[in-house]
Amino acid sequence: GLARFADNSFDTVVMARALQAVKAPDVLLLDMLRVAREAVITFPNFAHWQNRIHLGLKGMMPVSEALPYDWYNTPNIHLCTFKDFEQLCAQHDIHIVNRFAVSDSEKGHTPLMKALIRQAPNLLADVAIYRVTKRKPE
């Protein structure tokens, strides 16, 4: 954990593709913002359309580039979506500075597809990237 670090020890703390694998993601997120002015968090988006189709049609947990494990050997214990994460931030009064929607196969995407991914990230993005801060008193 981050208990050994004093408040405001860092400018930025980064957690890359690990949020879904920690025991208490909400507690860790708050601790990240205790030790740093801002946090950057990335995680696989469980609501991606391919995951939805796989689960809906095959009735099995999806395995993909973003989620490369079978259900029984995955380190992922708290899968979430863009909307889930944004709800968590709202519940804990965390300010979302930036949100980026990324597709692992984005290299071949047209500008139109990239725009669609930004407009419908919960459906079309494989990976979520957020930059967050503590909400400043108004």
Please tell me what each predicted stretch does.
Residues G1, Q20, F46-H48:
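Short, catalytically relevant binding-site loops at active-site mouths
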Residues D11-A24, F43-P44:
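A short SAM/SAH-binding and catalytic strip from SAM-dependent methyltransferases
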